[in-house]
Structures are given as C-alpha cells and as structure tokens.
C-alpha cells in the first residue's frame, strides 16, 4: 500500500483531542500499520468540552478548568493506539485554547482558536506555526477538514483556513491535501440501519455533519484492518466518547451514531487522486504519488 524507498509521510491537522479518532482513525491506523510515518498536529486541548459521566465533572472549564490537561493524556493514549509517530500541539502546548461553540463566552478568551480564523489576530501566527511543521515533516499527504470544518465548529473552520494559509508559506510543496467527508447516500443508509440502544437518542445523518455529495469522494479507506485500533483510540477519549455494543458510539449528547465501515476524503489541494480502471476510487490516500521525493 505504501511501499517505496521512502515511507509515505502523512500529516493530520485537527482542532481538538478526539477529532483525529472520530474522523479518520481507521485511515491513520491503517497507514501506520502499512509502514507510513504519521504525524498528528492538534490545535487545542479541548478545554471547553463536556465530560461523560460524573467522576470527572470537576475538570470542566466552569469548575477547575483542568480538562485540557486530562485530555492531553487521552490524546497520547489514542495516538499510541493509532500508531502515530509524533504528536504536536500547534504553536506549542497551550498556544491556543478551545473556543467552544460559536457565540459562547469562551470564544472571547484571548487564546481562543477562533482568533486564528481568516482575518483574526492569530491567523498569521497559527499559519506560520503550521508551515514550520509542514517543512519539518515534509508530508506527502495532509489530512484535515473541509471549509465548514465538518459541522461548523469555529475551531474546525479555523483549522481549515490555517491549513490553506500555511501551504504557500511552507517551502515544502505538499503533494496532496485531503478533507475528510461523509458521502450523503452511504451515511444516510448507515443511520437508517442503526438500532438506537435504549437510553440513547436517535438522529438523522443530516444532523451530525461532514456530509458531502457522493461524487466528491476521491478516496475511500476501508476501516476493517484497523477497526480494533480505531476502537482503542476512541476508548482512550473516555471523557468524550462512549463506545456502545456493535459498531456504535455516542458523545456527551447521547446521540447514537454508527461507526462507518470506511472513511472518505475529497481533494482540497494538490495532486488529484487517480481512479481505477473501473472508475472506482482508490483506498490509499497516497495513491499515484511519488513517495521517493
């Protein structure tokens, strides 16, 4: 899959701990299993997150405000489960803070990552920090979010905008940049087939984000070989994710969601992905790239 004189180098750029596991765990773990070098950049510690269960409620921002430090340990465990070679906090540990949801007081914090959105006071600083990581890692493929961040969270939107700003600042020309998406038809079918466990809430696919047109899919990565690693990574984020029987999970909102059988990406920038002779999309995010450069 990633056979070359030089192993494929993947750089995943995310907003909070758990985003890497919720959106592309199978892709990252599968790449690592195949010999790729996977680096994970995370912008914030997820300080404004809610907490599942009663035991650690004292960590939340409204109380001790220590959730970020705890989630850093969860991120370390998840990264180990996925086989991530290196984890990096964008700009250094604590440089940026979780903004919380749009319109909340936490977005006014002087370190809130919403300030890194295009036109914000920290946009250039964040872009330069990411450009340094791009030049250091020299990724063949950079994986991140689409323009709406998947579901509109201001930190996800900021990540997308920072990635686009960092690309021309870096000396290393990233051959391919991919955005994680969920094709509408497949995702709707997955939700329609889901039996909601007792005590949890049902939702339609349109309510959970990342949906895109089916024909925008450039890569479809089956999760089968990395399914156990995905579950281990999600389990590591225990303050945020609850694994339910079967391939089902829930966040603190207790909405049951299916774990997809594949992870999907569209091309955001760089080299297009070659299709197969029968017009099927490849299962390799580095398909068609020269990995020896």
From Swiss-Prot:
One example of a Gene Ontology biological process annotation: mycothiol biosynthetic process
The protein's enzyme class: hydrolase
The keyword Zinc belongs to this UniProt entry's keyword annotation: yes
SUPFAM superfamilies named among the record's database cross-references: LmbE-like
The UniProt record lists the keyword Repressor: no
Cofactor mode of binding and number, as noted: Binds 1 zinc ion per subunit.
Family membership: Belongs to the MshB deacetylase family.
Role description: Catalyzes the deacetylation of 1D-myo-inositol 2-acetamido-2-deoxy-alpha-D-glucopyranoside (GlcNAc-Ins) in the mycothiol biosynthesis pathway.
Entry-linked PANTHER family: 1D-MYO-INOSITOL 2-ACETAMIDO-2-DEOXY-ALPHA-D-GLUCOPYRANOSIDE DEACETYLASE, N-ACETYLGLUCOSAMINYL-PHOSPHATIDYLINOSITOL DE-N-ACETYLASE-RELATED
Name by which UniProt lists this protein: 1D-myo-inositol 2-acetamido-2-deoxy-alpha-D-glucopyranoside deacetylase
Annotated organism of origin: Nakamurella multipartita (strain ATCC 700099 / DSM 44233 / CIP 104796 / JCM 9543 / NBRC 105858 / Y-104)
Gene: mshB
């Amino acid at each position: 899959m990633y056979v070359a004189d030089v192993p494929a180098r993947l750089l995943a750029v995310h907003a909070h701990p758990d985003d890497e596991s919720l959106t592309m765990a199978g892709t990252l773990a599968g790449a690592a299993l195949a010999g790729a070098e996977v680096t994970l950049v995370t912008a914030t510690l997820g300080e404004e997150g809610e907490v599942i269960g009663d035991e650690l409620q004292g960590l939340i921002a409204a109380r001790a405000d220590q959730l970020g430090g705890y989630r850093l340990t969860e991120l370390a465990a998840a990264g180990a489960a996925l086989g991530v070679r290196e984890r990096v906090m964008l700009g250094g540990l604590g440089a940026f803070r979780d903004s919380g949801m749009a319109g909340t007081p936490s977005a006014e914090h002087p370190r809130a990552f919403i300030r890194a959105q295009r036109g914000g006071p920290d946009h250039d600083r964040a872009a330069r920090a990411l450009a340094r990581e791009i030049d250091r890692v020299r990724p063949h493929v950079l994986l991140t979010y689409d323009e709406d961040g998947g579901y509109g969270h201001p930190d996800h939107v900021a990540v997308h905008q920072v990635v686009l700003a960092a690309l021309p600042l870096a000396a290393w020309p990233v051959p391919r940049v991919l955005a994680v998406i969920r094709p509408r038809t497949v995702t709707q079918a997955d939700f329609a087939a889901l039996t909601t466990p007792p005590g949890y809430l049902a939702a339609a696919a349109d309510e959970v984000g990342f949906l895109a047109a089916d024909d925008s899919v450039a890569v479809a990565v089956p999760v089968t070989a990395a399914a156990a690693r995905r579950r281990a990574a999600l389990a590591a984020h225990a303050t945020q994710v609850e694994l339910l029987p079967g391939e089902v999970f829930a966040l603190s909102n207790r909405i049951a969601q299916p774990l997809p059988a594949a992870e999907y990406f569209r091309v955001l920038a760089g080299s297009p992905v070659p299709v197969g002779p029968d017009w099927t999309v490849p299962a390799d995010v580095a398909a068609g790239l020269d990995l020896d450069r």
